[in-house]
């Protein structure tokens, strides 16, 4: 099932808010539609929104081209549009990474161009490269993650939220590893937290694993402790939306609680994320901006009110797991282990030397 596809002048996105009961697509012909799709979680997952935003910049360049102003002013409009795209989801660093990468490329080549048509062509090529890279690095992450389970069979994995094909341009980050273990005949079952309040685990993770014939058991978030206590979980694998230079990990709300439970039960807690998820400007997770979402996501479920009117609501979209709780970080360049400041620093050297 394709979740992101660029067709001439149109970005086609699988509307993940309709899953699992309806397969519907959003056709974006304007960059604002892309921004709205990201904000409203029609497309979600840190790598996926980075890919979507890079395609959205093509539409932004096309709109700027329609402005009857000098080329320099059209470029200014494009840069302004790009900043708006970046602001749609402040926690997921992949979004800003993709937008900044594309805009930096435009600025590096702008002196050799004289029209927004040329700019749009350049952005199109780069967006396609970003998408293709995501597919490739998902495979490499899956292979790297599988090395953590060499010689083991009947493996039972717990995951939180959705870090699968629906969250990326490829196999997925956490679920890419799961798929590799399944392919190797090592996987017994995946336990998927439903992931309140928007049920990404129930609606998306359980959906895509079931569609692929991978054994999956759905549990409510407050059942994770029970599953661990009963010896049903061998390892936890989650994705990430931002990782600091210390190895602190921002991911979907509830991830921190799962990590604490895993530590208490001596269960390894793995994070799978590409290089683009690392924020080298931040050392501590306390500095990661946490997106706060609307109250109705907590007080209603599928349009049905589940709480009294007028109550206070706390609805952070993410929490931060301290690096001390992370057993290893799985990347496309291999597995990182503590000391994370050293291993993440080496990762940066490897990638930037290419």
Language model regions located:
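Conserved phosphate- and dinucleotide-binding cores of soluble alpha/beta proteins
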Residues: 195-354
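Long amphipathic alpha-helical segments
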Residues: 2-113
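Generic structural signal for well-ordered, non-membrane alpha-helical segments
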Residues: 27, 31-34, 46, 50, ...
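Conserved phosphate/anionic-ligand binding catalytic regions in large, soluble enzymes, centered on
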Residues: 40-56, 89, 95, 162-170, ...
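Short beta-strand segments
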Residues: 14, 52, 96-98, 158-162, ...
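Ligand-binding beta-strand-loop-alpha-helix segment within the catalytic cores
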Residues: 94-156, 186-188, 192-236
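Histidine-anchored nucleotide/phosphate-binding helix
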Residues: 172-183, 259
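Short, hydrophobic/aliphatic alpha-helical segments
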Residues: 26-42, 76, 147-151, 155-159, ...
């Amino acid at each position: 099932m394709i979740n992101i596809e660029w067709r001439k002048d149109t970005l086609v996105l699988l509307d993940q808010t309709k899953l699992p009961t309806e397969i519907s697509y959003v056709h974006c012909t304007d960059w604002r539609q892309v921004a709205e799709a990201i904000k409203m979680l029609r497309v979600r997952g840190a790598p996926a929104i980075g890919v979507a935003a890079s395609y959205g910049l093509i539409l932004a360049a096309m709109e700027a081209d329609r402005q009857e102003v000098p080329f320099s002013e059209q470029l200014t409009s494009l840069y302004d549009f790009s900043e708006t795209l970046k602001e749609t989801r402040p926690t997921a660093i992949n979004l800003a990474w993709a937008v900044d990468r594309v805009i930096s490329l435009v600025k590096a080549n702008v002196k050799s161009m004289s029209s927004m048509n040329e700019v749009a062509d350049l952005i199109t090529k780069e967006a396609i490269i970003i998408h293709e890279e995501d597919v490739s690095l998902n495979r490499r992450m899956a292979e790297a993650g599988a090395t953590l389970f060499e010689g083991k069979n009947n493996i039972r994995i717990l995951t939180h939220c959705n870090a699968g094909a629906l969250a990326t341009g490829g196999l997925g980050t956490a679920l890419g590893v799961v798929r590799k273990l399944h392919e190797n005949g090592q996987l017994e079952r995946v336990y998927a937290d439903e992931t309140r309040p928007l049920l990404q685990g129930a609606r998306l993770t359980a959906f895509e694993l079931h569609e692929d014939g991978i054994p999956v058991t759905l549990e409510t978030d407050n059942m994770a402790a029970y599953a661990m206590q009963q010896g049903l979980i061998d390892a936890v694998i989650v994705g990430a939306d931002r990782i600091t230079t210390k190895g602190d990990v921002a991911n979907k709300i509830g991830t921190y609680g799962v990590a604490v439970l895993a530590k208490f039960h001596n269960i390894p807690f793995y994070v799978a994320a590409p290089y683009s998820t690392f924020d080298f400007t931040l050392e501590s997770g306390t500095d990661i901006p946490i997106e706060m979402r609307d109250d109705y996501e907590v007080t209603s479920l599928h349009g049905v009110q589940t709480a009294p009117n007028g109550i206070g609501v706390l609805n952070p979209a993410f929490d931060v797991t301290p690096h001390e709780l992370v057993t290893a970080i799985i990347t496309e360049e291999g597995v990182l282990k503590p000391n994370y400041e050293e291993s993440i620093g080496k990762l940066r050297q490897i990638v930037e030397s290419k």
